[in-house]
Each structure stands twice: as C-alpha cells, then as structure tokens.
C-alpha cells in the first residue's frame, strides 16, 4: 500500500532533506520514525528536497508499506518518534501510481526577509536579513516579469536530475508588512 503524508519541519538543525552519512537530515528522521511504526525499513520520496536550514510547512512525501495501521496510528506513532522540530500533519492511503515528486502540479515557496538596520536576535533562522532599505513595491513590479514559462538553466546545480529547466511561474508577489518583506512564488 502507498501512503502520502504532509510534513512540517524546522530545518535549522538539519543538513537539508536528503539523507546524509554524517549529518542529521529530515529524511533520515522521517524514515526512522516510519520504520518504527511499520516494523520494517521504510524509504520515503519527497516532492522537493530542501537545503540546509530550510523549513517546510507542508512537504508532501510518499512511502510504501504493507503494515496494517489506521491513519490515526500512523500519525500518532510517527509524531511520537519524531523530534519536536518535525511533525506529520496528515496521512492518507493513495493510489500506487501516486509519486510525491512527479505527481505534484506545482510547488510554492515563501522567502521572508527582515529589512531593518539591526540584525534580529529572535527568529533569525526563519528569516533572511537585509540592513539596506528594500523597495518592496518595485520588487513586486519587477517580479512580474518572471510570470509565465522561462528557462532557468542558469540556476541549476551541476547534478540536477530534472530533464529540463523550463518552468511555468503561475504566481509571484512581493509584499511588505512592517519590517518583514515576503516573497511568494508558485511554479510547476
């Protein structure tokens, strides 16, 4: 049986999503917790890997297991085996054809920047920081040029496994609320 689940995590203490030999990763924590509940080794596939220190509010992953557990048992069992910085938000059985990475229609990202002269002491790991005044209105206007299909080859890593770098940006916006500048982008 294949299951999909939504995971929220604070990436501050992790080397990123992907399993590493000598560093803690979100993937290794989730696989360990799921394996404890399933009573067998479990491997998870995610919709998109995150880098060191990056957080996720609803990372979708899938895994396969023949263990008979209710959704509630999967949820409670996993969350009791995860560190406080990682939580399963929901879980459901899905069709065998579901793939967290390749079935996804889009991904949304949010970048938050504290824009003030003094570096923040609280919540610093959840924000970028820029001491120079950002013009969020002009940033928003300029960002609209990214709407639609574009080739983002220049932003790919050397080992990128995607077949192409053409992405369709369906939404992008920049807004300010006090000292916080938020950039949101949704693309395929």
PLM regions and their residue ranges:
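Structured-RNA-binding interfaces characteristic of tRNA pseudouridine synthases
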Residues: 1-188
């Amino acid at each position: 049986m294949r299951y999909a689940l939504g995971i929220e995590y604070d990436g501050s203490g992790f080397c990123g999503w992907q399993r590493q030999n000598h560093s803690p990763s979100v993937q290794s924590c989730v696989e360990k917790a799921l394996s404890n509940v399933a009573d067998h080794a479990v491997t998870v596939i995610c919709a998109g890997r995150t880098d060191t220190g990056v957080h996720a509010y609803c990372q979708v992953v899938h895994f396969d297991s023949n263990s008979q557990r209710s959704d509630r048992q999967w949820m409670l069992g996993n969350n009791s085996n995860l560190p406080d910085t990682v939580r399963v938000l929901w879980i459901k059985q899905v069709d065998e054809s579901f793939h967290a990475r390749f079935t996804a229609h889009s991904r949304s990202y949010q970048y938050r920047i504290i824009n003030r002269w003094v570096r923040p002491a609280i919540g610093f790991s959840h924000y970028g920081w820029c001491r120079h005044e950002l013009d969020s209105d002009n940033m928003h206007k300029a960002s609209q040029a990214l709407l639609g299909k574009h080739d983002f080859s220049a932003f790919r890593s050397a080992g990128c496994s995607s077949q192409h770098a053409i992405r369709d940006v369906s939404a992008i916006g920049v807004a300010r609320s006090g000292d916080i500048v938020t950039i949101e982008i949704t693309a395929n």
